[in-house]
From Swiss-Prot:
Signal peptide residue numbers: none
Entry similarity comment: Belongs to the UPF0213 family.
Protein's name according to its UniProt entry: UPF0213 protein Spro_0507
Transmembrane regions: none
Domain named GIY-YIG: residues: 6-81
Upper taxonomic lineage: Bacteria, Pseudomonadati, Pseudomonadota, Gammaproteobacteria, Enterobacterales
Organism encoding this protein: Serratia proteamaculans (strain 568)
Amino acid sequence: MTEILPTWHLYMLRMPSGMLYTGITTDVTRRLAQHQAGKGAKALRGKGQLVLAFHCQAGDRSKALRLEYRVKQLSKTQKERLVSHPPLSLDYLLPDVAVKAG
């Protein structure tokens, strides 16, 4: 029997200060609600209203973790470009991994 693995997503949240937070999850809506309720990352607690700025499918957990690492290495300008002009694919960040934005 084949086990169905969940699809992971990379997401970016914008804080009122303009800062972008990057994370991964299997359910973007659920994770955003957790963050807004103060039950997510400590870095976001008490930061005010969070807005989903970007999200994309990232494949399995391993690929999602690698993509998250690469996005966190981007400069603020590069992250803002990613948010304002979402590419059709994030393959350029992980040449060995196919990732669809959406």
